[in-house]
Amino acid sequence: MGLKSFESRRERKYKRGINSFFKKVDRKGISKVILDVRGNRGGYVLLLEHVLSYINDKGETFDLNYLYKRSKLDRFETLSRFKKLDFVKKALRVYPKGMISKEYDFYKSPMGSMSSILYQKKLSNPLDITYTGECTLLTNGLSMSASVLLASWFKDHNRGQVIGTPCFGSMQGTHGNAARIVLENSRIPITISTLKLSSIEQALIEITPTKKIQYSIKDLTMGRDPLIEYLKVLKNE
């Protein structure tokens, strides 16, 4: 399955595509699945979690530390007025219990405040399917952000082989929630991160592929994909 991005303007459509794929895998009894995140520059953690819900064979929570800085660019300030009111209403309903209460405390803190919140997400999907077969992940230097989190999870949970070249990030985590600003003097638009996501107790080391394979000049001129060729050889063996 090619995952070109975790960013989609149509969240429901994206999730339906993932649901459809794993429904077919389950129905046909497929025992080997390949996830290709080469060139996937990331997107929403919510969509990454949806993919993980299908391959989380050990049933563990997806744990991430979110390091926020309160600003006009954080995800709470970019919510619509209706969604912001809905968030406050839900938080006050359970306060001071639950993860949403920690988010509410951060939301009410002064601009410039920093806070670290541990999210422990219980992964689930509407089809209640957990694929437990062989799983392989393809990565390259343009696998970024949420793709880094996927690769880190893959290695940490020994979910399968990681094939290709190291992704753009380490086992320690990545950055997210991109915001666009325009520099005051030059008027040049830039995109910056407003959030750091860190895996629990991971060292700052690269995510080394199980099998390192990179394109050669000959591969490029012939339009050949060396990773796919390698997988074909494995299949024949």
Pin down the residues of each PLM region:
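C-terminal "post-core" interaction segments
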Residues: 1-237
